[in-house]
Amino acid sequence: MKKTLIALSVSAAAVATGVNAAELYNQDGTSLDMGGRAEARLSMKDGKVADNSRIRLNFLGKVEIQDGLYGVGFYEGEFTTADNADGSDLDNRYTYAGLGGKFGEVTYGKNDGALGVITDFTDIMAYHGNSAADKIAVADRVDNMMSYKGQFDALSVKASYRFADRADSSKNNVDNTYIDNGKDGYSLSAIYAIGQTGLTLGGGYADQDKSNEYMLAASYTMGDLYFAGVFTDGEKDYGTNGDYSHRGFSSVEDYTGYELAAKYTMGQTVFTTTYNNAETDGYTSTDNFAVDATYYFKPNFRGYVSYNFNLLDAGDKIGTSTISKADAEDELALGLRYDF
């Protein structure tokens, strides 16, 4: 029972470590796995090439505490490898620890908010896509967050609360006190698979300071075919101390977006396509159509080609800004990915 609970409840972290993760240690109810990926990614816009390659490395540790209770810790970091100013940067993607059992799993640290599982309905491409169902900060991957997830038969639920970051008032005298940045918030989501119909429904909500949004999603699987859609609506704070920045906006603006996705698996080849559209304050801020093909040489090694048709035109207005020629370019991406 203990081993079954652990296997089920850390499934999200197991996906991150990958099916090919190496078991470094497993003894007396304690285990440590290592996984990651090495991904070579070429991006071409207007005939100009950029190296967007990256490598990820992660560790998943688990320990049985008693019957029906376990401890878990997870870390994942990412390096970009291009020879430029960002080439030596380490992005600490995940760092969290917590407790789990029949009740689900509770963690604290840097982890995913509750809306990532909703955008995953349409975030299925090897490179492009997922550009319209934009998550506010508290619903995305963020630190200083308490998270809960649970799986109950066909129903999965997630909830997270991000604490406001502490700072001092910098008065440099006896009146100096602790303050916070006011960026606390929460996110909630639920996903339900309807029997053996192939139909799955999802929904979620997030709120942080002056920003908020809700999302609705649905998917249908029929053999080798997969179809999905996501809709989001809410408000984003582009103000001076807001969570977002855009040269065309300077206050709280309405945001509406939707994504459509389809996938067809043919042997070792997977074809995917997505359409993304979003409006900010009534202006079309995202409009693109993407297609890709991925070939799996082995389950842990794949190659792909992806093309994004940018449907925005240079000269179009977004708020008080104008879309540049660079912002309106299409993009071709070629990649090879090795999972370990």
UniProtKB/Swiss-Prot annotation:
Subcellular location per the Swiss-Prot or TrEMBL entry: Cell outer membrane
One GO cellular component term: cell outer membrane
Membrane-related topology note: Multi-pass membrane protein
Extent of the signal sequence: 1-21
Pfam families assigned: Porin_4
GO biological process, one term: monoatomic ion transport
Molecular-function annotations in GO: porin activity
InterPro entries, A to Z: Gram-neg_bact_OMP (IPR050298), Gram_neg_porin_domain (IPR033900), Porin_dom_sf (IPR023614)
Domain of life: Bacteria
Keyword annotations from UniProtKB, A to Z: Cell outer membrane, Ion transport, Membrane, Porin, Signal, Transmembrane, Transmembrane beta strand, Transport
Functional summary from the UniProt entry: Forms pores that allow passive diffusion of small molecules across the outer membrane.
Complex and partners: Homotrimer.
Similarity annotation: Belongs to the Gram-negative porin family.
Protein's name in the database: Outer membrane protein U
Annotated organism of origin: Vibrio vulnificus (strain CMCP6)
Underlying gene: ompU
